[in-house]
């Protein structure tokens, strides 16, 4: 059976198993990874507007906190890769040379201008995408983005979901902030805290997901993201263990699904051209877990895959 017959293909983001479909669904569910980030600078409201206009079913929000505890939509705990913070606040870097969002108030972050992602050398990380340079784009708060998406839903007659990741919860805890509680506070304020069919919450840290389920008692579906142990995530999780039957038994006790790296599922092609897959998906489904692999990108195809269409068709 082809992979697309086991899951719903999600363009540039994740896959959902058939069990996650509504009875009326008959086409792939699209989750926009950082918005339409291949066309417009990631996580800006412009990227989210374009994703909405392109028909995304879910739009992703990576969330970090400001120094005054406000959830903002930003992929990194640092600001310099996607904003002009170094030019506006040159004296605010820590000893490691990085500019941390947690060291700035929301008022200060509102003065920044967002741009296409850059590398350590200051050059575009993805040449050929949106050009670098000054512009009007800014860093939105989570509350602002929810209002923005809700407004577009109303004007366009749609119902778009949120796919929220808690970034670096242990870092935030060491800085004296409870990112899980602050994000849930925003969802309560905006009336999204009970929308089980419209919100997913994801995190690489199992303790944070257990806290969300057991202490904060959120009814929203939780996704345990699975990294590679070599990546150095700020968590005590053994991601190799999570890919075993025993590890998935543990995940099933607090989460509704897993978000594995695509290469933890796709193992390459055999000599006859057939696709080799790991047992991870089957093991997860045996335990009633949804599977949301990341990330399907036309500009970063796995070895042996010649086109994005082929990637979706494995």
Model-found features: residue ranges?
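Bacterial N-terminal signal peptides
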Residues: 9-19
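Bacterial N-terminal signal peptides that target proteins for export
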Residues: 1-11
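Phosphate-group recognition and catalysis centered on beta-loop-alpha active-site segments
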Residues: 21-314
């Amino acid at each position: 059976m082809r992979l697309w017959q086991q899951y719903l293909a999600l363009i540039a983001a994740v896959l959902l198993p058939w069990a996650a479909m509504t009875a009326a669904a008959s086409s792939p569910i699209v989750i926009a990874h950082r918005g339409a980030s291949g066309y417009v600078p990631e996580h800006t409201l412009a990227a989210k507007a374009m994703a909405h206009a392109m028909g995304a079913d879910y739009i992703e929000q990576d969330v970090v906190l400001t120094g005054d505890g406000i959830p903002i939509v930003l992929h990194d705990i640092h600001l310099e890769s996607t904003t002009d913070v170094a030019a506006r606040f040159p004296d605010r870097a820590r000893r490691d040379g990085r500019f941390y969002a947690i060291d700035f108030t929301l008022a200060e972050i509102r003065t920044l201008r967002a741009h296409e992602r850059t590398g350590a050398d200051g050059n575009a990380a993805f040449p050929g995408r949106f050009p670098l340079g000054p512009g009007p784009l800014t860093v939105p708060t989570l509350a602002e983005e929810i209002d923005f998406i809700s407004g577009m839903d109303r004007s366009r007659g749609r119902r778009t979901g949120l796919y929220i990741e808690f970034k670096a919860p242990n870092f935030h805890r060491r800085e004296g902030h409870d990112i899980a509680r602050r994000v849930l506070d925003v969802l309560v304020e905006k009336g999204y805290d009970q929308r089980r069919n419209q919100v997913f919450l994801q995190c690489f840290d199992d303790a944070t997901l257990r806290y969300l389920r057991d202490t904060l008692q959120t009814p929203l579906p939780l996704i345990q993201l699975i990294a590679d142990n070599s990546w150095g995530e700020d968590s005590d999780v053994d991601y190799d263990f999570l890919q075993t039957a025993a590890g998935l038994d543990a995940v099933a006790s607090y989460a509704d699904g897993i978000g594995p790296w695509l290469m933890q599922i796709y193992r390459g092609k055999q000599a006859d051209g057939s696709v080799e897959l790991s047992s991870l998906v089957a093991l997860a489904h045996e335990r009633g877990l949804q599977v949301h692999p990341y990330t399907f990108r036309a500009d970063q195809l796995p070895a042996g895959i010649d086109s994005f269409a082929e990637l979706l068709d494995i």
